[in-house]
């Protein structure tokens, strides 16, 4: 069976109504990266960062996968398909894609602020400011902040290397 690897970014979810970051009316038009998407922002203004990602989760909750998400998921009927996405939403999974690698993290999960490999599903759609991980540390959004390494990069490169076709 042919292996197809599909690489997606903000454009695929924009058609579902999710705001992108860099468009003129995107998220960075209303927020400064330094204020909501850096380790320093989390350290210095935890409440603002948590509120920002809670807002993003609420936005995602009201959106549905679009024809692009469904078409990618539909490829699994005939091909071995893996999705590598820069998106932090769960629209690929909700459309039916069974193997999705999120390069920049996932809004539906939180992680330990001490151990980046200790990842837990969020309890509901709102992160509590004082939520703690099983290791006792504060939980943080499971998002790769600017200035942080991309932990799934090597895995994505491995997946891409197995493709008969990269889309």
Each language-model region and where it sits:
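Conserved catalytic core of sirtuin-type NAD+-dependent deacylases
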Residues: 1-166
């Amino acid at each position: 069976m042919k292996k197809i690897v599909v690489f997606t970014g903000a454009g695929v979810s924009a058609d579902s109504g999710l705001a992108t970051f860099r468009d003129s009316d995107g998220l960075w038009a209303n927020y400064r990266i330094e204020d909501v998407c850096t380790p320093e922002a989390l350290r210095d203004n935890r409440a603002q960062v948590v509120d920002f990602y809670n807002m993003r989760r609420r936005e995602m909750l009201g959106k549905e996968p679009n024809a692009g998400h469904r078409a990618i998921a539909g490829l699994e009927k005939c091909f071995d398909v893996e999705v590598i996405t820069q998106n932090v939403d769960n629209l690929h999974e909700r459309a039916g894609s069974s193997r999705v690698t999120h390069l920049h993290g996932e809004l539906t999960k939180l992680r330990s602020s001490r151990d980046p490999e200790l990842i837990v599903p969020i309890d509901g759609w709102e992160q509590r400011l004082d939520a703690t991980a099983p290791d006792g540390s504060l939980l943080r959004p499971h998002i790769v902040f600017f200035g942080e390494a991309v932990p799934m990069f090597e895995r994505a490169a491995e997946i891409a290397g197995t493709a008969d076709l990269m889309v």
